[in-house]
């Protein structure tokens, strides 16, 4: 018989494995992505001080409600977090894809942040 693969557990294992290598500092904080079915969330985190510096999501008031779970919405969220980060003086980050495959919404979010001026 075939075993059913638990995708959430696989993602969590992948995320923990990557988190051993990816670490955010005050000079180069970590850009962390969380993707739900309907929305996408992103934070810029300083792991040394355990502080979230900047956060944005598709639930923010500046985004339309019908654009949360698609690639266009993810690109807008990436641009928004980059704009907020640049206002705080952050230009370089380490990208933490959260165990997700670098494809689709995660890729669009990264491209939106890059186009808005963040360096990975």
From Swiss-Prot:
Q: Which UniProt keywords apply?
A: Ribonucleoprotein, Ribosomal protein, RNA-binding, rRNA-binding
Domain of life where this protein originates: Bacteria
One term under GO cellular component: cytosolic large ribosomal subunit
One GO MF term? structural constituent of ribosome
Q: Which GO terms describe its biological process?
A: translation
Cross-referenced SUPFAM superfamilies: Translational machinery components (SSF53137)
Q: Where is the signal peptide?
A: none
Q: How does it assemble?
A: Part of the 50S ribosomal subunit; part of the 5S rRNA/L5/L18/L25 subcomplex. Contacts the 5S and 23S rRNAs.
State the function annotated in the UniProt record.
This is one of the proteins that bind and probably mediate the attachment of the 5S RNA into the large ribosomal subunit, where it forms part of the central protuberance.
The family annotation for this protein states: Belongs to the universal ribosomal protein uL18 family.
This protein is called Large ribosomal subunit protein uL18
The gene coding this protein: rplR
């Amino acid at each position: 018989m075939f075993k059913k693969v638990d995708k959430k557990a696989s993602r969590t294992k992948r995320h923990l494995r990557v988190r051993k290598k990816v670490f955010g500092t005050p000079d180069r904080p970590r850009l962390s992505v969380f993707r739900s079915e309907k929305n996408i969330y992103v934070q810029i985190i300083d792991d040394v001080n355990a502080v979230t510096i900047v956060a944005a999501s598709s639930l923010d008031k500046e985004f339309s409600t019908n654009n949360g779970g698609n690639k266009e919405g993810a690109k807008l969220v990436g641009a928004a977090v980059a704009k907020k980060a640049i206002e705080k003086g952050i230009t370089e980050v380490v990208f933490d894809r959260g165990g997700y495959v670098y494809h689709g919404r995660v890729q669009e979010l990264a491209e939106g942040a890059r186009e808005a001026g963040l360096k990975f």
